């Protein structure tokens, strides 16, 4: 498995364009293993785009597997078209109700991919201007039984697509750092609600700027590490954020914010992964790579898969009690590397319980 994982990484670099040459290790590829890793990490479309660039003699896989991969890639394309339409329509619906919006992650991220239709889509995360009280009150007026948490509220699905309405793009568990993060979002929100892009030929939406995404998506990855687990898909998203624009004008500002938010070492770990796994040149990194943190985070990524769904270490079951026990077990792993965020987690959970009761 370790050998096939290295072949997977070699091929992934070719697929995302950081390596131009077809990796020689591909001659020893077990395509069933590569397929399984791609499926676990939600990178089916990315790898199939790479397969399409290969000469026939390099694709020594069974026809049945190739056809299955092709079919899944075509399904991804259709799903992205559907998600694009949902993002446009939901944004327009809120606009007519008097709310400015910005699509977070998802279809906005897909625009940075060479092939936007190869990204595995999820749901619609839409940042709605107005603050938690106003937005929650509005959603309750539409659908009274939706569940609200600190940063978003559930919303009726649109044509089968799940929608999460955010009044805060993301948050940190440490109260001190979170306060600074929310002030940052308040400071830069105007540009995010105004930065509009076309989604293919289907229509226009507001998406975040690159500078915003460098901070927001890092906090999103961090939150998933603390809560459920992260997969390579989130890191591929961040790779494309890093190469999507000239960072020389924003690097100093981003570094200042990362230090303020207590994310410097975590960012260094992600930069290590960007360099070692994705083959990113040093000129594109936003902070110096941190090998110690990078190896720890990479191990978490490979163990957990997308959203932690494949983590064999989840030994306590899916019940509420099992979830809480798993949380304690995860905190024990994380506290050595991220003590502030980990130790604040129980306090935040208690505070959040009363916050939800008040809504």
Language-model segments: which ranges?
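Conserved NTP-donor binding/palm subdomain of two-metal-ion nucleotidyltransferases/polymerases, i.e.
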Residues: 1-122, 127-359
């Amino acid at each position: 498995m370790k050998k096939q994982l290295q072949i997977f990484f070699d091929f992934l670099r070719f697929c995302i364009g950081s390596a131009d040459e077809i990796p020689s290790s591909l001659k020893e590829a077990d395509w069933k293993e590569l397929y399984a890793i791609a499926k676990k990490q939600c990178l089916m479309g990315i790898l199939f785009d790479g397969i399409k660039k290969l000469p026939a003699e390099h694709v020594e896989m069974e026809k049945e597997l190739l056809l299955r991969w092709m079919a899944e890639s075509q399904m991804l394309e259709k799903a992205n078209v559907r998600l694009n339409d949902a993002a446009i329509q939901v944004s327009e619906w809120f606009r007519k109700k008097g709310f400015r919006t910005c699509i977070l992650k998802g279809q906005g991220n897909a625009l940075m991919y060479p092939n936007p239709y190869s990204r595995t889509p999820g749901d619609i995360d839409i940042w709605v201007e107005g603050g938690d009280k106003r937005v929650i009150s509005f959603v309750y007026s539409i659908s009274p039984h939706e569940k609200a948490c600190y940063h978003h509220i559930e919303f009726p699905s649109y044509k089968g697509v799940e929608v999460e309405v955010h009044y805060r793009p993301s948050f940190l568990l440490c109260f001190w750092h979170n306060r600074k993060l929310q002030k940052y979002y308040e400071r830069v929100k105007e540009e995010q609600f105004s930065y509009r892009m076309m989604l293919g030929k289907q229509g226009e939406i507001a998406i975040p700027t690159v500078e915003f995404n460098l901070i927001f998506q890092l906090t999103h990855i961090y939150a998933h590490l603390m809560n459920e687990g992260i997969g390579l898909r989130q890191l591929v998203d961040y790779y494309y954020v890093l190469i999507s624009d000239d960072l020389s004008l924003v690097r100093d500002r981003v570094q200042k914010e990362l230090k303020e938010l207590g994310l410097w070492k975590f960012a260094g770990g992600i930069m290590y992964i960007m360099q070692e796994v994705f083959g990113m040149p040093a000129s594109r990194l936003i902070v110096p790579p941190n090998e110690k943190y990078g190896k720890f985070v990479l191990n978490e990524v490979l163990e957990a898969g997308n959203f932690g769904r494949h983590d064999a270490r989840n030994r306590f079951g899916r019940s509420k009690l099992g979830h809480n026990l798993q949380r304690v077990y995860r905190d024990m792993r994380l506290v050595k590397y991220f003590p502030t965020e980990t130790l604040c987690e129980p306090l935040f959970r208690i505070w959040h319980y009363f916050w939800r009761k008040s809504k």
